[in-house]
Curated annotation (Swiss-Prot):
Subunit-level organization: Homotetramer; dimer of dimers.
Binding, L-methionine: E57, Q100, D250, K281
Annotated source species: Latilactobacillus sakei subsp. sakei (strain 23K) (Lactobacillus sakei subsp. sakei)
Record protein name field: S-adenosylmethionine synthase
EC category: transferase
Annotated region (Flexible loop), positions in chain: 100-110
Family indicated by similarity: Belongs to the AdoMet synthase family.
One GO CC term on file: cytoplasm
UniProt: K(+) binding residues: E44
Residue sites binding Mg(2+) per the record: D18
Amino acid sequence: MQERHLFTSESVSEGHPDKIADQISDAILDAMLEQDPQARVACETTVTTGLVLVVGEISTTAYVDIQKVVRETIKKIGYRDGQYGFDGDNCAVIVALDEQSPDIAQGVDDSLESREKDEDPLDKIGAGDQGLMFGFAVDQTPELMPLPIALSHRLMRKVAELRKSGQLAYLRPDAKAQVTVEYDENEQPKRVDTVVISTQHDEDVTLETIQKDMLEQVIKTVIPAEYLDDKTKYFINPTGRFVIGGPQGDSGLTGRKIIVDTYGGYARHGGGAFSGKDATKVDRSASYAARYIAKNIVAAGLARKCEVQLAYAIGVAQPVSVSVNTFETGTVSEEAIQTAIRENFDLRPAGIIKMLDLQRPIYKQTAAYGHFGRTDVDLSWERLDKVDALKASIAKLNH
């Protein structure tokens, strides 16, 4: 049993340079999938002052005006003004996309199992790469996410809402939030110890105004009052000034916010990024499947906290390993849970794609404010439609 301790997670806004890159990569992916659900996409984006570079490997029958997709995405985020050092109408966009390597394609199109004459059509697609992926759920919030990352995302969504609605017209698109939560010895969140918000702003607004607005209109409306007390510390724009931001302040790159995208460091991460990748890339699809499994396990009351690891070999359909850790919070054995997983979840790439309906243009909405625990959009891997099946499998094992 742990003693009382602190844990910190961060989130960044949709106007953060790395997140601009993620959103551009996923907007291109969505545009391809809209025309060609079978599109193979691995799309990486770099953004810097006045420039966007899009590279990667794409095999598709779709025709997409990539320049237009890039510019629309940037403008929608809020970079419409040349004085921000980056704007959707005037930045340069360089596109350098190749086809998927035929050596990779042959293993994805025709898995080891289907080459060895297995007749199951879901064995046809091999994993697009080797790798390991983690999914996680914990009963700290209604959406079964760790509290620090959940609060950090909510703060960032609120800041964006106040900016886009014009209520706080001095806000600019780039922002970051960080929340430190104090846990008791039973790993239950007790209070928020520290909140950090840094938000880009216009030249003529005072630091006092920003600090007051962030405290009253963001922090106190987002974080439940029972978590805040007179010892909670607030650091709002602690450098004193944040006028230069976005790609003018820092260059951005797809896949550099993998902890923000997942569990805020509260659970392990296999290292593979999500944005710009179609669902044959198990970095993305198997991470979604692992979250789906873990969330349904916790919702079914089989554990209060659950981490699922999946691992794959390139060109092979079946995962090479599936493991479960319930951190001694399980109501049944981990072995029983593993049996229930095998009975209820098809973890071959084609099985995951079918189970979660992943060949749709649904990805741009995941590219900011987290891929998991989202309450503002309907994501198939967040559904709790396997709870009864898991309970039934466990009941059957107990007879």
